[in-house]
């Protein structure tokens, strides 16, 4: 592909800012616009320092520039409550939407499990689940392919400072979307999820515990060889992703313990959840350049929108 795909980021908070910093290192995508609603927000000021165009008028402030700036992709890092309308407005202009909120109106898109299938179908809206869903759904999928998972539960423990106001407003949606990912992506019959905000002390680590109830007696002989290759593959995207200790087998349920040490692009001291949420958003479109170049898929034509 001869030129980078041009992108807009909606939401200049923790996740949106971290995403911009990762995009600036990308060879195939160019962040052009940062969209917010507060002209004095630190995120918009920071985006301008990075050389991005900005608007404090929400998505409506971006729409007049979609054609002129050839915006093909938008990454929504706002809130589940406003995502559906953001997506509708930009989809009407032929802009693909990557949803980093827990809204989950599009297909769940999870690394190592179904990312290539979703991108290959050129879905106009794909949902990146949550940081917890990206970290744990592949583990559930790894177990369910060798033993049926009747019930799966994840417990996410993150440092409070890394959770921005948008995520705090969406805790219920966060838990519901993670539970849905256990079922729709991981293959569990029933899912549950909770998030625990750690305000007691600062920690670089973000920790996930996954409890599995297996329909039959858990057998570590097929389970261990099934999940270890998944961990190795996820480390290509999350270098700090690892098993905290050996999976604990004690009849039913059994548990897998994951910890993650982040890269610290933004909120350098406490970014745990950001570095799990933002890297999957970029590989979601990583196969676009090749597929577009060989005409396997074609992006929608950008045409003036008629009300």
From Swiss-Prot:
Gene3D superfamilies listed in its UniProt record: Dihydrodipicolinate Reductase, domain 2, NAD(P)-binding Rossmann-like Domain
GO biological process: catabolic process
Reaction catalysed by this enzyme: acetaldehyde + NAD(+) + CoA = acetyl-CoA + NADH + H(+)
Entry annotation: catalytic residues: 131
Signal peptide start and end residues: none
InterPro entries: Acetaldehyde_dehydrogenase (IPR003361), Acetylaldehyde_DH_C (IPR015426), NAD(P)-bd_dom_sf (IPR036291), Semialdehyde_DH_NAD-bd (IPR000534)
EC number: 1.2.1.10
Chain positions recorded as NAD(+) binding sites: 162-170, 273
Enzyme class at the top of the EC tree: oxidoreductase
UniProt-recorded Gene Ontology molecular function terms: acetaldehyde dehydrogenase (acetylating) activity; NAD binding
Keywords of this entry: Aromatic hydrocarbons catabolism, NAD, Oxidoreductase
Family: Belongs to the acetaldehyde dehydrogenase family.
The protein, known as: Acetaldehyde dehydrogenase 1
